[in-house]
Amino acid sequence: MIAPRIALQFLTRLPVSLPGMPTPEQIGRSLLWYPAVGLLLGLLLWLAHLLLGQTPDVLQAAIILALWVGLSGGLHLDGLADTADAWVGGFGDPGRTLAIMKDPRSGPIAVVVLVLLLLLKFAALLSLLQAGQGIYLVLLPWLGRSLLPLLLATTPYVRAGGLGQALVDHLPRRQLPWVLGGHVAAMLLLGWGALIALATALALFVWLRRALMQRLGGTTGDTAGALLELAECAALLALALSL
């Protein structure tokens, strides 16, 4: 099957090759595999936690966070940085916001937002490890990447052309609710913490989607990446605060 390999190649830096250029339909079907890719990343983080069992918690949290960023190649952090710059510099104007978002250069707002996000993730991750709740490392990337197909299925895509447009146009919408429902049910097997994380991430999803609709009339690839990073951070903070 080529769809899961497309999802792996796009969302991770794992060595995955494709037999050829995928069709738009295959690209669209790959969205169904985003939650599974998130689960795989979560399992890798949990495995790292188990292998680092004798490492001091502070060092372990730093290593796991670096691995977390490295496995995705910083793809979603880049989207968050672009979104932060554009949101502040756009002054409420949709066209200006989209133009700034497309600029590859990062301004001071992007740097500040990234530093704050990584600082919050590190502190919350450290609290989680100190409480002996490393199992939730499985949940966070899984939950974050499950929100991407939900966003693209419910929100207009405002930047015509490219990979994002193919994802939206060819997303298997009839199958998506079943796929997401199955993953959510599996997440809840992790206990009450999973329910807290899920509720937090969904609340952030509703708030951010509304903000995107008001400012841009839809979403872009960058804002999807921003959603993922913010949802992971919010869920991680909620877990840490609930311990």
From Swiss-Prot:
- What Gene Ontology molecular function terms does this protein carry? adenosylcobinamide-GDP ribazoletransferase activity; cobalamin 5'-phosphate synthase activity
Q: What is its main location?
A: membrane
**Annotated TM spans:** 31-51, 61-81, 109-129, 134-154, 188-208
Protein's membrane topology: Multi-pass membrane protein
Cell location: Cell inner membrane
The UniProt record lists the EC number as 2.7.8.26
Its UniProt entry gives the catalysed reaction(s) as: alpha-ribazole + adenosylcob(III)inamide-GDP = adenosylcob(III)alamin + GMP + H(+); alpha-ribazole 5'-phosphate + adenosylcob(III)inamide-GDP = adenosylcob(III)alamin 5'-phosphate + GMP + H(+)
Does the entry feature the keyword Transferase, yes or no? yes
Q: Give the UniProt keywords, A-Z.
A: Cell inner membrane, Cell membrane, Cobalamin biosynthesis, Magnesium, Membrane, Transferase, Transmembrane, Transmembrane helix
Supply one GO CC term from the record.
plasma membrane
Alphabetized NCBIfam families for the sequence = cobS (TIGR00317), PRK00235.1-5 (NF001278)
Highest taxon listed in the record's lineage? Bacteria
Signal sequence extent: none
Q: Does the keyword Ion transport apply?
A: no
Record's function text: Joins adenosylcobinamide-GDP and alpha-ribazole to generate adenosylcobalamin (Ado-cobalamin). Also synthesizes adenosylcobalamin 5'-phosphate from adenosylcobinamide-GDP and alpha-ribazole 5'-phosphate.
Q: Which family does it belong to?
A: Belongs to the CobS family.
> Which Pfam family, an example, fits this chain?
CobS
**What pathway, per the record?**
Cofactor biosynthesis; adenosylcobalamin biosynthesis; adenosylcobalamin from cob(II)yrinate a,c-diamide: step 7/7
User: Tell me, what is an example of a GO biological process annotation in this record?
Assistant: cobalamin biosynthetic process
Q: Which gene encodes it?
A: cobS
Required cofactor names? Mg(2+)
Protein's recorded name? Adenosylcobinamide-GDP ribazoletransferase
